[in-house]
C-alpha cells in the first residue's frame, strides 16, 4: 500500500492535470450550452410555487436503481465571495443541486427551491447525483444561464476561489438538447489529500432551472487497495481512478424534466 506521502503526491498530480486541462477549457466549446430555443407554447411549469416544486421533485419511483433522499441541511456551501465575480455562477450552481450544502439555501433571485440526493440503490456505485429545482422570474432564469456561459467562456474562470475553497479544472462539456436551453461543465476541488470531481448540467424550462450535479471522490489510497486486491485475486471496491470523471445519468435528467 502506498504511503500517506505518495497518496498526497497522487492526488496533487490529479490537481495539476486538471489545472493543465483548464487552460483550454471554454475554447471552441459551443458545448458550454445550447442556445436558447424559441419560446414554446405556454404550459404550467413547476415554477408556479413551492408546492409545485415539491410535487415535481424526484422520488425513488421515478428512477429505477436509485435511492432518493432529501439533502442534509447540516452541510453548508463554501462561505465567502468568489475571487472573480464572473466565475461565481459556476460555484453557485453547485449549491443549487441537492447535496454538499446544495438545497440548504435558495439560490440568489430564486423564488423557491427544492433539492434531492440520488445514490445507487445497490450501494455499489461511487457517484452521487444532486438534483435541484429552482423557480425564478423567467428573465432571471434566462440571465442565470447567460451568466454561466459567460463564466465558461472566460479563461479567468479556469481556476478560481470562493472564500477558502479553490475550484480548478473548469471546462465546458457537451450539453443535452433538453428544455429551452442547457449548459454543462465540470470542475474539481481539493478535500484534504483527495480531489472531489463534479460534472454539472443545468437545464432551463421556462422559468424553472433544473440542476444536476454528479460527483465522486478521487481517493489514491482506495485505488491502491483495489489494485492490491486484484493482485491477490479478489474484487476491489470500485474506487474511481484518476481518469474516471463522474457523469450525470441521462435517465435522471429525463425523469426530472418529465415532471417539470
Segments (PLM) and residue ranges:
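A small/polar (G/S/T-enriched), proline-flanked helix-loop surface module common
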Residues: 51, 55, 67-205, 251-252
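Compositionally biased, intrinsically disordered low-complexity segments
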Residues: 11-19, 66, 71, 255-256
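A short, solvent-exposed beta-edge/loop patch
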Residues: 169-260
Amino acid at each position: 500500500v502506498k504511503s500517506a506521502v505518495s497518496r498526497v503526491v497522487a492526488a496533487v498530480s490529479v490537481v495539476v492535470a486538471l489545472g493543465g486541462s483548464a487552460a483550454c477549457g471554454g475554447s471552441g466549446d459551443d458545448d458550454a450550452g445550447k442556445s436558447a430555443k424559441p419560446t414554446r407554447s405556454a404550459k404550467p411549469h413547476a415554477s408556479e410555487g413551492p408546492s409545485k416544486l415539491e410535487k415535481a421533485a424526484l422520488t425513488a419511483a421515478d428512477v429505477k436503481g436509485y435511492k432518493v433522499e432529501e439533502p442534509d441541511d447540516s452541510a453548508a456551501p463554501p462561505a465567502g465571495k468568489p475571487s472573480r465575480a464572473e466565475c461565481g455562477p459556476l460555484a453557485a450552481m453547485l449549491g443549487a443541486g441537492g447535496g454538499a450544502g446544495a438545497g440548504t439555501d435558495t439560490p440568489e433571485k430564486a423564488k423557491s427551491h427544492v433539492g434531492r440526493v440520488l445514490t445507487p440503490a445497490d450501494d455499489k456505485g461511487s457517484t452521487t447525483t444532486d438534483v435541484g429545482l429552482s423557480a425564478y422570474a423567467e428573465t432571471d432564469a434566462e440571465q442565470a444561464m447567460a451568466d454561466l456561459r459567460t463564466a465558461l467562456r472566460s479563461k479567468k474562470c479556469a481556476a478560481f476561489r470562493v472564500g477558502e475553497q479553490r475550484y480548478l479544472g473548469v471546462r465546458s462539456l457537451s450539453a443535452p438538447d433538453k428544455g429551452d436551453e442547457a449548459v454543462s461543465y465540470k470542475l474539481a476541488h481539493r478535500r484534504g489529500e483527495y480531489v472531489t470531481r463534479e460534472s454539472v448540467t443545468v437545464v432551463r424550462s421556462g422559468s424553472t432551472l433544473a440542476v444536476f450535479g454528479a460527483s465522486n471522490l478521487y481517493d489514491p489510497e482506495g485505488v491502491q487497495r483495489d489494485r492490491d486486491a486484484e493482485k491477490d485475486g479478489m474484487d476491489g471496491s470500485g474506487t474511481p481512478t484518476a481518469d474516471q470523471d463522474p457523469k450525470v445519468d441521462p435517465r435522471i435528467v429525463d425523469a426530472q424534466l418529465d415532471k417539470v
